[in-house]
Amino acid sequence: MPKLRSATSTQGRNMAGARALWRATGMKENDFGKPIIAVVNSFTQFVPGHVHLKDMGQLVAAEIEKAGGVAKEFNTIAVDDGIAMGHGGMLYSLPSRDLIADSVEYMVNAHCADAMVCISNCDKITPGMLMAAMRLNIPTIFVSGGPMEAGKTKLSDQLIRLDLVDAMIEAADPNVSDERIDAIERSACPTCGSCSGMFTANSMNCLTEALGLSLPGNGSMLATHADRKELFLKAGRQIVELCKRYYEQDDVSVLPRSIGTFKAFENAMSLDIAMGGSSNTVLHLLAAAQEAGVDFKMEDIDRLSRKVPCLSKIAPNTNKYHMEDVHRAGGIMGLLGELDRAGLIHKNTHTVLGMSMGEQLDQYDIIRNQDEELHKFFRAGPAGIRTTQAFSQDCRWDSVDNDRVNGCIRNKENAISQEGGLAVLFGNLAEDGCIVKTAGVDESIWKFTGTAIVFESQEDAVAGILGGKVKEGHVVVIRYEGPKGGPGMQEMLYPTSYLKSMGLGKKCALLTDGRFSGGTSGLSIGHASPEAASGGAIGLVRDGDIINIDIPNRAINLEISNEELAARRSGQDQKGWQPAHREREVSFALKVFGHFATSADKGAVRDKTLLK
C-alpha cells in the first residue's frame, strides 16, 4: 500500500521540527496523517485569464478541508502572451512553461505534498503544470479559470463578435479609422478569462478534458458564469477521493501517468485536430508526453490528422463561433461524443472522475443524454457585461445547440472537412516535420508555390511587411526564431496579422522555425524542424528560391537539387548556424534555455543528453 508522501515530514520523533513549522501554518494535531494537497494557483493581476483567480485557491482549499484533506496553496508565475507579443517580452513566454513545471516540482517535492489541484488558464501555465503533473505522478486534477466572453460591438449598424486578434489586424490597417480601432479595442476583451476563441489557452484547457485530467466543462464553461464555481468545488472534493483510492486502496489508475497514456494522448490530439485548435498544442502535448514517458511523436500526429475530420470551426478560424458557442453545443464532451460515434477515440482510458472515457461520455454527451440538469449546465451563456469578477452572472441560452448538421459542432457526415484542422508537413525544408493549422487556411491555397523572401528575425519580417517588401506570391521565411535560435521560440502573430491587414492573407505563405499564436490563421507554417540554429534546412533558404507547399500530400520542399542543398549546407557549416546581422539583447536566463532546448518536434523540452 502506498504511504502518504507527507508522512516523511509529519511522522516520527525526528520530524518534530518540521511538525512545529507545519503547526505554524495552521495545522492541528488531527491534521497529521491526512493527505496534504497542494493547491497550485496562478493568480496574477497582469493577465485577464488569471486576474479572477485570487480567491479560487481558497475556494478549492475549503472544499478539500471539508472532505478530509489538508490544503496548502502556492502560486506560479503566468505570462500573458498577448501583452508580451510584438516585443522582446515574447522571448520569455515558452521558457516560462518549463520554469512553471520546475517550480511546481520544487514546491511539491520540497514539502512532500500528496496530491495537487492545478488552477491554470492561459497559454503556458496549463502546459507547464501538465508537465509537472506527469513528472511528479501524484493524484492531480486540473481546473482552469475559464474562457472570456466574446467581444461584441456595433459597427456600420451591424453587431459583430470579435476578440483581441481583430484589434491587432484592424490596428495594422492604415485604411481603418482611429475611431473604429478604438471601438474594437474597447470591446474585444470584455471580461476576465482566457481569450474567447480557440486560441492556445482554451485549446489546452479543452485537451485536459480529453486527456481525462479535468472535469467535464472545464475547457468551455465561461469564467464569468456562476456554474463554473461548482467545477472548483467538485475538484476540491474529488482530489480527496483520488487520494483515498491511491493511498488507501492502492488504485494506481488515478495517477496522471495511468490517465495520460498513449491512447489518452491520441484522444487529446484527435480532439485538437477535430476542433482546429492552436498549433501550439502540438508543442505542449509532445512535451507532456515526454514527461509521462509516452512515446508520442510527430508521426503519430500526422497519422491522426489524415483520418480525423474537422468538426468545428471556431475563432480565429471564423468570427461566427467562440468558446461560449462551443459550450452551448455540449462542450468538449460534445466534440468527443461525435468522435466516438465516428469510431475515432479510445473509450477505455481513465479519467479523474474515476470512470472510463466511454462512461463519462454516456453521462455528459448532450446527444446521448437528455437529462434536464445536464442540458441546463450546457445552456450557461454570456451576460455581455464588462467585468473582472468570476461567477458574476447566471445567464442561459434558451436551448442547447444540438444541430450536428450546420451547428457549432458537426457530426462526421457533415464535417467541415473530412481531414482535420491540423496537419504535419515533411520535406527537405522540414525533415522532422512542421505544423500548419489547416482549419485557418482557405482551401484555395492548400497547394501553394511561391518565391522565398528571407528574414533573420520577426522584427525584420514585420518591417519588411509594413514597408511593402512582401508581395503577392511570396513565401515569407522567418528563421533563427526556434527554441534555440531565438532563443525562446516567440510567436509570429504580428507578421500574420499584418499580412492580413495588407490584403495578403490569401496571397502569401509564411514559414518559420518559430511558432504561432493560437490566434493565427492563414497559410502559416511553423515549428520547422530541425530549426535553423540546429542545422535545419530552413537556414539554407535564399531570397528568390522556389518553395512548394502541398497540404493535401503533407509536403513542403525547397525546389533545388540535392547537390545544391548539400553545397549550401557545407558552406553554412563553415560559417556557423547563426543569424546574420541580427541585433538582439539576450539575457543569461534565455541563454540557458536556448542552450538546453531541443527543436519543436521534440516539444522544445530540454536536451537531457547534454547532462550526461
Curated annotation (Swiss-Prot):
> Which co-factor is required?
[2Fe-2S] cluster; Mg(2+)
- What name appears for this protein in its UniProt entry? Dihydroxy-acid dehydratase
**Keywords in UniProt for this one?**
2Fe-2S, Amino-acid biosynthesis, Branched-chain amino acid biosynthesis, Iron, Iron-sulfur, Lyase, Magnesium, Metal-binding
N6-carboxylysine: modified positions: 124
Quaternary data: Homodimer.
Question: Which EC class does it fall in?
Answer: lyase
For the biological process aspect of GO, one term held by this record is: isoleucine biosynthetic process
Name the cystine pairs.
none
Q: Where is the active site?
A: 517
Which InterPro entries does this chain map to?
Dihydro-acid_dehy_C (IPR042096), DihydroxyA_deHydtase (IPR004404), DiOHA_6PGluconate_deHydtase_CS (IPR020558), ILV_EDD_C (IPR056740), ILV_EDD_N (IPR000581), IlvD/EDD_N (IPR037237)
The family assignment reads: Belongs to the IlvD/Edd family.
Tagged with keyword ATP-binding:
no
**EC number of this enzyme:** 4.2.1.9
**Record organism:** Haemophilus influenzae (strain PittEE)
GO CC, any one term: cytosol
